[in-house]
Amino acid sequence: MKQSKVFIPTMRDVPSEAEAQSHRLLLKSGLIKQSTSGIYSYLPLATRVLNNITAIVRQEMERIDSVEILMPALQQAELWEESGRWGAYGPELMRLQDRHGRQFALGPTHEELVTSIVRNELKSYKQLPMTLFQIQSKFRDEKRPRFGLLRGREFIMKDAYSFHADEASLDQTYQDMYQAYSRIFERVGINARPVVADSGAIGGSHTHEFMALSAIGEDTIVYSKESDYAANIEKAEVVYEPNHKHSTVQPLEKIETPNVKTAQELADFLGRPVDEIVKTMIFKVDGEYIMVLVRGHHEINDIKLKSYFGTDNIELATQDEIVNLVGANPGSLGPVIDKEIKIYADNFVQDLNNLVVGANEDGYHLINVNVGRDFNVDEYGDFRFILEGEKLSDGSGVAHFAEGIEVGQVFKLGTKYSESMNATFLDNQGKAQPLIMGCYGIGISRTLSAIVEQNHDDNGIVWPKSVTPFDLHLISINPKKDDQRELADALYAEFNTKFDVLYDDRQERAGVKFNDADLIGLPLRIVVGKRASEGIVEVKERLTGDSEEVHIDDLMTVITNKYDNLK
């Protein structure tokens, strides 16, 4: 394709709010253009990359007998009300109303809709298992879109849904999909690591995320260097081994602590290590207030709280709620309280006595507080995030951290949707049973960004061969010169029969063409310049920067060999 005919609006400067390298490079190289916050148009080069990604995805889905369909993005509220997610999903769900007053959502996922499609069709165990997938735009009303395609309000996804008669069948499809995802990410050129994760708003009993390692990743991966253990930090279990630091029990004292609001400020004020301070936070669980205690250097993990209490309806109490409940602001909270409120403490609080806690009075704290004498703990548990260097639950060693971008996730849904939506089949005994489900998502547009995030240098994108928008970049330095133009035209005609060629025939300065070529990042470059009359051209590899002069008689062999050896 001739570059003069392709819409590639490269930029010299990018908006300052473009923080991620992938966002900056996708804008700068003319692959995407922002419409409004969190919403982008995919321009010709990006569309070609997306087509290459989806072709790989389709191949791997068909390899495991997953069948493609296409469902509407617009979903009626009644389906979401059946599953209970219309009220539970939260403000991220894009809701709208038609002229007749009917409520709809622009789908972030399609569990409800696909369940409604199959519930009157898959009626016998003989029809199972069945796996359906689609590739489609999704919508989520992100509060703060950022990082370009990595956290947008409209995005492209591959979502698949499987239906089973028993858990063994679900396990097999889950494993097949897990392996397919591993192959997909390897093929598109992403270093992605599967990690144990939380199922979030989709629900289900078991899930893995596929995380593309990246410094700008919004998720922290906990992993072992001695085993294949890997988990999202939200799910990483903290191993408790008692390490009591008990001293002689001291009398309870109330001390003045002016302008002290955080655990670190309190530790500095008292001249004590922060891990000897105990923080108190108040949450609402299904509308009931509870207190949760952790040591000063630890952070409460609300995902673990949701798992512990078996509900998603957990939120941190607001400042007004806290003041109304205990008469003090959040920085002064403590468990010594004359109100009926259940108290839960992280396991590691047990290692301390003579605790330092808030006095439930602004400007004051209590020291030498002891469990059993001054207050009681209803239950201990693992309520916090793991720290780097702590022991891992598989016994393999200690926790190491890395940042990652979630590009895919696989879920075992069980009967969450089939039971609430009455999707049943007859088993081999003729008894009605709820369909057992799995769901499996890949962020296609996220994958595009993740590829760029992991495959770039200071000059621009470096596309992996499998997804590159074109194989070769043919550049005529000066098309006004007959010998250069004629040779470039001839090479374009020859190489276009075997490769996808982007032919830069523009009337631009050589420096502009070379800068754009580096920015766009096609794997191989053929430059027709001042030695065209001798039949000599330059061949350059984008990844290594290696270049050599080649006679046109040898050019097809050289290019073919180089292309075959590309990653």
Curated annotation (Swiss-Prot):
EC number(s) recorded for this UniProt protein: 6.1.1.15
Cell compartments where the protein resides: Cytoplasm
Keywords: Aminoacyl-tRNA synthetase, ATP-binding, Cytoplasm, Ligase, Nucleotide-binding, Protein biosynthesis
GO cellular component terms, A-Z: cytosol
CDD domains attached to this UniProt entry: ProRS-INS (cd04334), ProRS_anticodon_short (cd00861), ProRS_core_prok (cd00779)
Top-rank EC class of the record's enzyme: ligase
Task performed by this protein: Catalyzes the attachment of proline to tRNA(Pro) in a two-step reaction: proline is first activated by ATP to form Pro-AMP and then transferred to the acceptor end of tRNA(Pro). As ProRS can inadvertently accommodate and process non-cognate amino acids such as alanine and cysteine, to avoid such errors it has two additional distinct editing activities against alanine. One activity is designated as 'pretransfer' editing and involves the tRNA(Pro)-independent hydrolysis of activated Ala-AMP.
Protein name according to UniProt: Proline--tRNA ligase
